[in-house]
Amino acid sequence: TAPAAGTVSAINRGAKRILQSVVIDIEGDDEETFKFFSSDELTGLSKDVVINNLVESGLWTALRTRPYSAVPAIDSEASAIFVAAMDTSPLAGDPSVIIAENADSFADGLDVLARLTSGKVYVGKAPGSKIPTGKDSSVTSEEFSGPHPAGLVGTHIHFLSPVSATKTVWTVGYQD
């Protein structure tokens, strides 16, 4: 989803043709706006309102199904939703540092995800990390430790709610 419509007027490159900036002349003022909900309103939102806002904003495509890693159908429901708030990849940054910058927004996002399933929202985290879980009782935090692939969402799914041809779960990245 683009924040505005316009025409590319300049592409600025530096040494060795490294891209430094792209200048876009914005046409008009027809920006997209979305309904805003306060933190207190989020737990009372209906599933339809959440789905409509995610689809209109283009964020619905951040959700992925397991198995098959496809964008979920709008009329489908996951048996659980997984958020991997840890990364065991070599040289990976610490997600708890990134999440701490907007901890309240992260917790609000988990509460909104809980509207999309009648099951649980699992937040996979490293032992001892300070990851918020929101206000909704269906959001649960699970700790995983060990070398890679302990931080992969597929590992979390395997141990907490294994999928099959008839059972689908959804995943979303912690930065989405």
Predicted features and spans:
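Buried, small/hydrophobic-residue-enriched core segments of structured protein domains
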Residues: 14-176
